[in-house]
């Protein structure tokens, strides 16, 4: 099962470059019997468009050839912790034992492992960091944010 994490899109619903890199990675990994779970709802920092981020992600993957039958319900999340919580709720409705391939961005993998490892404890997971292809300065800003977020989690734990 492929779980592709959401990221910012534009007010128009157009997906941003980080989302596209994650979705292209998902498409590259997709096989005929795969299931796909798209995450991302709405939030002031990543999606203020009419539809959920997951809606736009699914539409993108369908345009690239992923069939409707491959998609699970959306995890309409607000952040990475919420991605894991809502993913767990969806997985609880399915047959146990599937390998989860969690797709995020290269700079985000460490925090995703920390969060999903706690919330989805007991699931077999593989983590893929899609190459973000960002300018060095933008990449460094995101990496700095991730380091601070990880330190906060390690110091205070997760709240969910």
Explain the meaning of each model-derived region:
Residues 1-144, 148:
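A structural signal for short, hydrophobic/glycine-enriched beta-strand patches
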Residues 143-160:
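A polyampholytic, Gly/Pro-enriched intrinsically disordered region
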């Amino acid at each position: 099962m492929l779980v592709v994490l959401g990221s910012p899109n534009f007010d128009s619903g157009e997906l941003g470059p980080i989302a596209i890199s994650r979705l292209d990675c998902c498409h590259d990994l997709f096989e005929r019997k795969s299931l796909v779970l798209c995450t991302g709802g709405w939030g002031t920092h990543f999606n203020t468009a009419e539809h959920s981020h997951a809606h736009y992600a699914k539409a993108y993957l369908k345009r690239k050839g992923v069939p409707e039958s491959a998609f699970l319900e959306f995890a309409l999340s607000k952040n990475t912790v919420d991605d894991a919580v809502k993913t767990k709720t969806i997985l609880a409705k399915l047959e146990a034992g599937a390998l989860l391939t969690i797709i995020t961005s290269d700079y985000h993998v460490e925090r995703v492992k920390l969060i999903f490892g706690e919330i989805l404890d007991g699931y077999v997971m593989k983590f893929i960091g899609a190459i973000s292809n960002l300018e060095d300065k933008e990449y460094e800003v995101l990496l700095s944010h991730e380091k601070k977020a990880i330190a906060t989690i390690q110091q205070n734990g997760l709240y969910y």
